[in-house]
């Protein structure tokens, strides 16, 4: 037997003599971004990875079944992370954190778990393996409406481009106004498309009153309950964001 060969007893001794604490401290220092932290307000944006190929058998562009699944995924994210609002369009989700920071603000933890929860939830709903990447955008309160409109504009532009190239397969992409005008000439009227396809959906918390009865006294009681709702109106979405800002400013 070679002198360099470990026996079971040798390996046992080698493992036992190692200091877990020292090794943990050593490799913790080598972790990338382990010390990075974020504070409110901030946005987590989740972008679908390879959704075009993975969802090619769905209606293109903007299958209502896919969008419905994305909205349901937002509901799960809202409940899991207790963020203020979620916005979804195309293959992306933006989570707005205005007054609560999960995982003590640890960026590494936040981006990995938000991507994991979103990927798992959407995969189950659409019965296929789907993946999101995740990034942190540090914003000021004054940036919130601008960020929302930025993602609305990006999603809107992508949708019009997809419609255009579905009709005009071999053309270069012209200016947005020209695409809309040429599509209309071909009978594709953007104004007739559903709002969720054009502008996405905002998921937000709201409070309702629920009437119940005191089991001891039999008296009627009114309790407040927080529920999730969806709006497809950009005007309404902006109003909701402004109201949330006023509560944390």
Predicted regions span which residues?
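Regulatory and interdomain segments flanking nucleotide-handling catalytic cores
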Residues: 1-249
């Amino acid at each position: 037997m070679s002198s360099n060969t470990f026996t079971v007893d040798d390996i046992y001794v080698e493992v036992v003599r190692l200091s877990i604490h020292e090794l943990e401290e050593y490799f913790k220092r080598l972790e990338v971004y382990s010390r990075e932290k974020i504070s409110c307000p901030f946005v987590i944006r989740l972008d679908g990875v390879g959704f075009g190929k993975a969802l090619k058998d769905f209606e293109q562009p903007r299958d209502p079944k896919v969008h419905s699944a994305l909205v349901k995924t937002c509901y799960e994210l809202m409940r899991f992370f207790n963020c203020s609002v979620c916005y979804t369009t195309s293959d992306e989700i933006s989570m707005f954190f205005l007054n609560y920071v999960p995982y003590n603000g640890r960026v590494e933890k936040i981006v990995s778990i938000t991507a994991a929860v979103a990927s798992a939830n959407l995969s189950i709903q659409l019965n296929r393996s789907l993946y999101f990447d995740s990034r942190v955008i540090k914003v000021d309160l004054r940036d919130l409406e601008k960020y929302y409109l930025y993602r609305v504009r990006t999603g809107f532009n992508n949708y019009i481009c997809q419609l255009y190239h579905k009709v005009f397969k071999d053309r270069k992409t012209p200016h947005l106004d020209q695409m809309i005008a040429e599509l209309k000439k071909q009978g594709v009227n953007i104004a007739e498309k559903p709002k969720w396809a054009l502008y996405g959906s905002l998921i937000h918390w709201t409070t309702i009153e629920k009437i119940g009865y005191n089991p001891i006294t039999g008296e009627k009681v009114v309790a407040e309950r927080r529920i999730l709702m969806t709006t497809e109106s950009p005007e309404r979405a902006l109003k909701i964001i402004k109201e949330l800002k006023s509560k944390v400013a």
